């Protein structure tokens, strides 16, 4: 959303290099690498009915309680990569469902954001959340989670970005860190 992708696609030579410094104002310190992210909807389905005859339907929002239970019981990992510590996070960030105040909802979506440490690839992160063979990819609709935290639920991918290893094994990185620490 900041336009960097357009620059990278139009002028890859502008960003080619052996080393990069990205300004990050938080604490003005050096942070190596970054967590990756996958964002996806976990979907429940019900049967719409008038709320005066709720027994004729099935409430998809009520079924979302199981999704929230799994999120609540999940323990976020703390992972060390190249001597740096990364904290993972698995959180619901949005919930949507229902079409009216007197209609039993036939769908509910819990939007989930998983921030994963640089010891994992995108594929490994997805496998932990939805199973290795779920098939959910950006733009290909809803797929059934075959394993992972959300096994049995519908999954629709919304966004993904790989993690970045810290590169502390690079002489350039070590030199910069030593220089910054000395000042």
Where are these predicted regions, by residue range?
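Metal-dependent amide/peptide-bond hydrolase catalytic core
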Residues: 25, 32-33, 39-183
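Acidic/histidine-rich catalytic neighborhood of metal-dependent amide-processing enzymes
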Residues: 1-39
């Amino acid at each position: 959303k900041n336009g960097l992708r357009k620059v990278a696609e139009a002028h890859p030579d502008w960003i080619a290099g052996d080393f990069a410094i990205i300004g990050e104002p938080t604490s003005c310190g050096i942070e190596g690498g970054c967590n990756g992210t996958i964002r996806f909807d976990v979907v429940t389905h019900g049967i719409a009915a008038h709320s005066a005859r709720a027994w004729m339907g099935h409430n998809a929002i009520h079924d979302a309680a199981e999704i929230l239970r799994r999120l609540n019981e999940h323990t976020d990992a703390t992972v060390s990569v190249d001597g740096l510590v990364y904290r993972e996070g698995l959180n619901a960030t949005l919930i949507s469902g229902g079409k009216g105040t007197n209609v039993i909802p036939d769908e509910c979506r819990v939007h989930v954001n998983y921030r994963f440490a640089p010891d994992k690839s995108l594929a490994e992160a997805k496998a932990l959340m939805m199973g290795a063979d779920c098939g959910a990819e950006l733009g290909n609709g809803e797929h059934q989670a075959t394993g992972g935290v959300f096994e049995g639920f519908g999954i629709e991918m919304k966004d993904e970005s790989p993690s970045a290893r810290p590169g502390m094994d690079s002489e350039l990185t070590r030199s910069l860190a030593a220089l910054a620490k000395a000042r």
